[in-house]
Regions:
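Short, charged beta->alpha transition segments
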Residues: 89, 97-104
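Oxyanion-binding/catalytic loops of NTP- or PPi-dependent enzymes
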Residues: 1-72, 80-85, 94, 104-604
Length: 604
């Protein structure tokens, strides 16, 4: 039976995922991008442009570019661009068609069966419109499922005790909903949902853009406003991990360039009134379900906007969440995953990818590739693998019920790599060296450029506590399976010792992780800049400035000592490199667009 993929058709971004070798994974495009902007541009001549290229063109021709079409699904059949076949369904179909091409390129085979997600509060007309869009894109839509149900599947919550109730707080780019789910006989049932189809991260972007426009003298044209909006989104994203961001918009008008410092405090003062609107929906959903917040076992955060620290603080406050620490993006609560003091704030799943991953799991169940299992005991400590940079990547979190199965897709870190060392770890620390090593083995695969290989690593613990680790090259099907006996057989004293160590060293561990992750990102930025310079140096006026920015980043990386360095300085240097390479990025995109238009016969 052919694969059934999972699709999150989002307001601002969309994603597609599939289960391979028992592991759900996002299917990235040829450039490694895991999210597709839900943006479609309709040129005056030629075929529509979808995704990243359309988003770039938006700043030049905003009137011919459609964003947030999901907000209009099932509500209007009118074209969103004058003179074009651009109804909400038709725009969504183009996005879904692009996702199909992306999936087929990643998998190397034809796919035409999909599970597509919708907000829980979508009415029948909106659901039918979504299904119609899928069919127009060439998909056989096997099922339309609710986004909160998909998110719960991605979190592995089918292993919760019977009758457990969870809330899914889903704040995306253009929509918000709060859903209360209950697990009944292994199936999630929606007890209540409340939301707003016109409330999301777009509104925060608009508030920032409005604030920025007050810094501009006189009126802006459509292109200027589009540039302001793009800068607003970039600032919002940056301030999820930084306290300060400098917005620079050269020649916003012929005689005016905008440069302004924008802080996290500024962002939160603008965002708070918008986020406070979600509180009413949260309360109403709880009332409709006849519950209070302390009846919940978890509150799951989904949607890219929930990366904002203010969102997490507000949700934790509204739902009276228990004390929690964010470690590796997961939640640690001491001896019990559940807390008597309130629900767990679950931040352990990538908020941008959870819905697509969950939809792919549903697709795998429908195709017979996955089946439900009886869940019994729990894992005493987290299990994972060492990743590039010497960090631990958790596959099965501590206190997961067993039998349990989970996995992730990994890729090669360097060009020409022919094998991957799988180092299996157990523990609660950030750095691999601080956790217990359970074993190592190597899987060979076809030589590929950096990021070209796809190796799935799956952990499966049976009811006897025996861990089997499978690594599979999804291109050739080559695999290795290694049994490990000691994954669950750990004394209470040793467990307590590890947990106490993780708490004692939490801050230094997180500092080390932040540095390593920032350093890896910096290394990628330097490599991309060097590659671009090699191809286009002669066409750039600021090549020397880019060289200097690269040298600044490399100097900070070389001065680091034992996973410790000047993190604020490194982030600032990378931000500077990103800024000075904007002309290079535009040049690369222009050349790519020219090549695409020539291929389509639009240019000679």
């Amino acid at each position: 039976m052919s694969k059934i993929v999972g699709i999150d058709l989002g307001t601002t971004h969309s994603a597609i995922a599939v289960v391979e070798a028992g592991m759900p994974g996002i299917l990235a495009d040829a450039e490694g991008r895991r999210l597709l902007p839900s943006v479609v541009h309709f040129p005056a001549n030629g075929e529509p442009v979808v995704g990243v290229a359309a988003k770039r063109i938006q700043t030049v021709e905003p009137e011919r570019t459609v964003v947030s079409a999901k907000r209009f699904m099932g509500r209007s059949e009118n074209s969103l661009v004058k003179g074009e076949a651009a109804s909400p369904v038709e725009v969504s179909a183009l996005i879904l068609k692009e996702l199909r091409a992306q999936a087929e390129a990643a998998l190397g085979e034809s796919v035409d069966r999909a599970v597509i997600t919708v907000p829980a509060y979508f009415n029948d007309a909106q659901r039918q419109a979504t299904k119609l869009a899928g069919e127009q894109a060439g998909w056989k839509v096997e099922r339309i499922i609710n986004e909160p149900t998909a998110a719960a599947l991605a979190c592995g919550l089918q292993g919760l005790p019977e009758g457990d109730q969870v809330a899914v707080y889903d704040l995306g780019g253009g929509t918000f909903d709060l859903s209360i789910l209950e697990l009944r006989e292994g199936v999630f049932q929606v007890l209540a949902t409340h939301g707003n189809t016109a409330l999301g991260g777009d509104d925060v972007d608009a508030a920032i853009a409005e604030w920025l426009e007050t810094k501009v003298e006189g009126e802006l044209d459509a292109t200027g406003k589009a540039r302001i909006r793009e800068a607003a989104e970039q600032a919002k994203i940056a301030l999820s991990s930084s306290d300060e961001y400098r917005i620079q918009l050269p020649f916003l008008k012929p005689d005016f360039s905008l440069e302004v410092n924008f802080s996290r405090a500024d962002l939160e003062s603008l965002a708070r009134p918008i986020l406070e609107q979600t509180k009413t929906h949260c309360r109403q959903a709880l009332t409709d379900a006849g519950m209070k917040s302390t009846d919940l076992s978890q509150v799951i955060l989904v949607g890219g906007q929930t990366r904002m620290p203010l969102v997490r603080r507000l949700v934790a406050e509204w739902f009276e969440c228990a004390e929690y620490e964010e470690v590796r993006g997961d939640v640690r609560l001491g001896d019990s995953f559940h807390s008597a003091d309130g629900p767990v704030l679950n931040t352990g799943v990538n908020p941008d990818e959870a819905v697509a991953l969950g939809a792919s799991i549903q697709g795998a169940v429908l195709s017979g590739e996955m089946t439900s299992t009886l869940l019994l005991d729990v894992t005493p400590l987290s299990l994972g693998v060492e990743t590039f940079g010497g960090l631990m990547n958790v596959i099965i979190p501590r206190n997961s019920t067993i039998p349990a199965k989970a996995g992730e897709m990994f890729t090669n870190a360097v060009d020409g790599q022919r094998a991957m060392l799988v180092h299996v770890l157990q523990g609660e620390r950030e750095r691999a060296a601080d956790n217990w090593s359970l074993g190592r083995f190597e899987l060979e695969f076809e030589s590929a450029p950096r990021g070209g290989a796809r190796v799935g690593v799956q952990f499966e613990i049976d009811a006897d506590g025996i861990l089997q680790v499978l690594a599979r090259d999804t291109t050739t099907g080559r695999e290795k399976i290694v049994p490990i006996q000691s994954a669950v057989d750990v004394s209470d004293d040793r467990v307590q010792e590890m947990v106490e160590e993780s708490v004692e060293h939490a801050f230094e561990d997180m500092d080390a992780r932040r540095w390593v992750e920032a350093a890896l990102k910096a290394d990628e930025a330097v490599k991309a800049a060097r590659d671009g310079l090699e191809a286009f140096r002669d066409e750039l006026d600021n090549a020397q400035i880019i060289d200097e920015a690269i040298a600044a980043v490399e100097g900070l990386l070389q001065s680091a000592d034992n996973d410790q360095g000047d993190l604020p300085a490194l982030k600032a240097a990378v931000a500077r490199l990103d800024q000075v390479t904007l002309p290079l990025a535009d040049l690369i995109m222009d050349r790519a667009m020219e090549a695409m238009l020539r291929k389509q016969g639009v240019l000679d």
